Amino acid sequence: MIEIIGILILGYLLGSIPFALLVGKWGHGIDIRQHGSGNLGTTNTFRVLGKKAGIIVLIGDLGKGAVASLVPILLASELHPLFAGLAAVVGHIYPVFARFKGGKAVATSGGMLLVTSPILFLVLLISFLTTLRLSRMVSLSSIVSASIGIVAAITIGIVEQDWIVPTFFTILALFVIFKHRENISRIRQGTESKIGMFAKDKKDTD
């Protein structure tokens, strides 16, 4: 029991590492919480600091979920890797190192799935990148991939007859969509920011 609690705490602390805040302060001298949406996540980093900083934060946030999920495997723990990954997701959303105000945990959730369900991760990655390429909106890409992921997760659960990952992913995906409710409103109004992810420069980055 002590080992399980320790792994969960470690996962939470890993998730609490605010890469967006660190990259903003160390690399650009700004507090990203005071710019854009104010979220400590990949989307706001791309929007405010550009794609180089955004990619760094994306890798960091993705890595948090992946590393946290790997810990139970490396320690041969009885704890399912999914729960360690979920602890990192909670840490990202409510980070102890950033006054409990973080991001929406899309990338961190992706890192968790990379370890716990690689097939589902691949489905999400393809849907995310395809939507991003077409819309240049990270928020819309997150919403679309979460929605497609729910269908994929249920399908995987039916095929494999293992509902642990599909069940918790579905709950997490619905939460991610809920966290994007303000983005959904802006998308409908045509005012949602776009990024220059696939552009050669930052001139079209909001």
Curated annotation (Swiss-Prot):
SMART domains: G3P_acyltransf. Its main location: membrane. It catalyses: an acyl phosphate + sn-glycerol 3-phosphate = a 1-acyl-sn-glycero-3-phosphate + phosphate. The chain crosses the membrane at residues 4-24, 55-75, 78-98, 112-132, 137-157, 158-178. Pathway: Lipid metabolism; phospholipid metabolism. It holds the Pfam family G3P_acyltransf. One of its GO terms (biological process) is phospholipid biosynthetic process. It is found in: Cell membrane. GO terms for molecular function: acyl-phosphate glycerol-3-phosphate acyltransferase activity. It is a multi-pass membrane protein. Its EC number is 2.3.1.275. Catalyzes the transfer of an acyl group from acyl-phosphate (acyl-PO(4)) to glycerol-3-phosphate (G3P) to form lysophosphatidic acid (LPA). This enzyme utilizes acyl-phosphate as fatty acyl donor, but not acyl-CoA or acyl-ACP. Probably interacts with PlsX. Belongs to the PlsY family. This is Glycerol-3-phosphate acyltransferase. It comes from Exiguobacterium sibiricum (strain DSM 17290 / CCUG 55495 / CIP 109462 / JCM 13490 / 255-15).
